[in-house]
Protein backbone atom coordinates (compact mmCIF):
# COMPACT_ATOMS: atom_id res chain seq x y z
CA UNK A 1 0.00 0.00 0.00
CA UNK A 2 1.24 3.47 -0.75
CA UNK A 3 1.77 5.86 2.12
CA UNK A 4 -0.94 8.15 0.73
CA UNK A 5 -3.49 5.31 0.53
CA UNK A 6 -2.60 4.17 4.05
CA UNK A 7 -2.96 7.70 5.48
CA UNK A 8 -6.30 8.18 3.71
CA UNK A 9 -7.61 4.89 5.14
CA UNK A 10 -6.26 5.82 8.58
CA UNK A 11 -8.05 9.18 8.54
CA UNK A 12 -11.36 7.81 7.18
CA UNK A 13 -11.65 4.48 9.01
CA UNK A 14 -8.95 4.19 11.69
CA UNK A 15 -10.61 1.19 13.33
CA UNK A 16 -10.03 -0.89 10.17
CA UNK A 17 -6.24 -0.50 10.21
CA UNK A 18 -4.26 -3.60 11.19
CA UNK A 19 -0.80 -3.71 12.71
CA UNK A 20 0.32 -6.02 9.90
CA UNK A 21 -0.90 -3.51 7.33
CA UNK A 22 0.95 -0.69 9.10
CA UNK A 23 4.23 -2.63 9.19
CA UNK A 24 3.84 -3.72 5.55
CA UNK A 25 3.37 -0.08 4.51
CA UNK A 26 6.45 0.95 6.47
CA UNK A 27 8.60 -1.87 5.10
CA UNK A 28 7.60 -1.26 1.49
CA UNK A 29 8.49 2.43 1.70
CA UNK A 30 11.41 2.66 4.16
CA UNK A 31 14.73 1.03 5.02
CA UNK A 32 14.78 0.19 8.73
CA UNK A 33 17.78 0.39 11.03
CA UNK A 34 17.12 -1.00 14.52
CA UNK A 35 17.65 1.75 17.05
CA UNK A 36 17.05 2.18 20.74
CA UNK A 37 14.17 4.40 21.75
CA UNK A 38 12.54 5.75 24.86
CA UNK A 39 8.76 5.63 25.26
CA UNK A 40 7.72 7.34 28.44
CA UNK A 41 9.37 5.40 31.24
CA UNK A 42 10.15 2.38 29.03
CA UNK A 43 13.53 2.01 27.33
CA UNK A 44 13.64 -0.24 24.26
CA UNK A 45 17.09 -1.37 23.15
CA UNK A 46 18.12 -1.52 19.49
CA UNK A 47 16.42 -4.54 17.93
CA UNK A 48 13.96 -4.80 20.81
CA UNK A 49 10.29 -4.16 19.97
CA UNK A 50 11.20 -3.39 16.36
CA UNK A 51 7.54 -3.31 15.32
CA UNK A 52 6.83 -0.49 17.74
CA UNK A 53 10.05 1.25 16.70
CA UNK A 54 9.03 1.13 13.01
CA UNK A 55 5.50 2.27 13.78
CA UNK A 56 6.51 5.20 15.98
CA UNK A 57 9.23 6.32 13.54
CA UNK A 58 6.76 6.16 10.63
CA UNK A 59 4.08 8.02 12.57
CA UNK A 60 6.57 10.72 13.54
CA UNK A 61 7.73 11.17 9.93
CA UNK A 62 4.10 11.36 8.77
CA UNK A 63 3.23 13.75 11.63
CA UNK A 64 0.37 11.57 12.82
CA UNK A 65 -1.60 12.57 15.88
CA UNK A 66 -1.49 10.49 19.03
CA UNK A 67 -4.90 8.97 18.19
CA UNK A 68 -3.85 8.16 14.61
CA UNK A 69 -0.62 6.59 15.87
CA UNK A 70 -2.48 4.40 18.35
CA UNK A 71 -4.86 3.29 15.58
CA UNK A 72 -1.83 2.04 13.61
CA UNK A 73 -1.47 -0.70 16.24
CA UNK A 74 -4.83 -2.10 15.11
CA UNK A 75 -6.36 -4.81 17.30
CA UNK A 76 -3.47 -4.62 19.75
CA UNK A 77 -4.77 -1.17 20.68
CA UNK A 78 -8.51 -1.34 19.94
CA UNK A 79 -9.13 -4.79 21.43
CA UNK A 80 -6.27 -5.88 23.68
CA UNK A 81 -5.41 -2.56 25.35
CA UNK A 82 -8.75 -0.73 25.35
CA UNK A 83 -10.49 -4.02 26.17
CA UNK A 84 -8.28 -4.49 29.24
CA UNK A 85 -7.56 -1.01 30.63
CA UNK A 86 -5.88 -2.38 33.76
CA UNK A 87 -3.75 -4.88 31.84
CA UNK A 88 0.02 -4.93 31.69
CA UNK A 89 0.50 -6.19 28.13
CA UNK A 90 1.59 -3.96 25.23
CA UNK A 91 3.59 -1.55 27.37
CA UNK A 92 4.70 0.54 24.38
CA UNK A 93 1.06 1.28 23.56
CA UNK A 94 0.12 1.94 27.18
CA UNK A 95 3.10 4.25 27.73
CA UNK A 96 2.35 6.17 24.54
CA UNK A 97 -1.24 6.64 25.69
CA UNK A 98 0.13 8.35 28.81
CA UNK A 99 3.13 10.27 27.51
CA UNK A 100 2.24 10.85 23.85
CA UNK A 101 4.83 12.27 21.49
CA UNK A 102 6.62 14.04 24.36
CA UNK A 103 7.72 10.62 25.64
CA UNK A 104 9.14 9.28 22.35
CA UNK A 105 12.88 9.75 21.85
CA UNK A 106 14.94 7.85 19.26
CA UNK A 107 18.68 7.39 19.78
CA UNK A 108 19.29 7.26 16.02
CA UNK A 109 17.43 7.42 12.69
CA UNK A 110 15.23 4.33 12.41
CA UNK A 111 13.70 4.88 8.96
CA UNK A 112 15.07 6.23 5.70
CA UNK A 113 12.90 6.43 2.55
CA UNK A 114 13.71 3.77 -0.03
CA UNK A 115 15.33 5.13 -3.17
Where are these regions (language model features)?
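N-terminal first-folded block
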Residues: 5-40
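Amphipathic protein-protein interaction modules
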Residues: 41-91
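Short acidic/histidine-centered micro-motifs embedded in hydrophobic/aromatic stretches
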Residues: 25, 29, 72-76, 96
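Basic/polar N-terminal segments that are highly enriched at the extreme N-terminus
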Residues: 1-5, 113-115
Amino acid sequence: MTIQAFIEKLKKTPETITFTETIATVESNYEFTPTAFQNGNQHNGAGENSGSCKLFAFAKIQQLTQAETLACFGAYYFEEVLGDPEGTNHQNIRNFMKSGWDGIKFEDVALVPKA
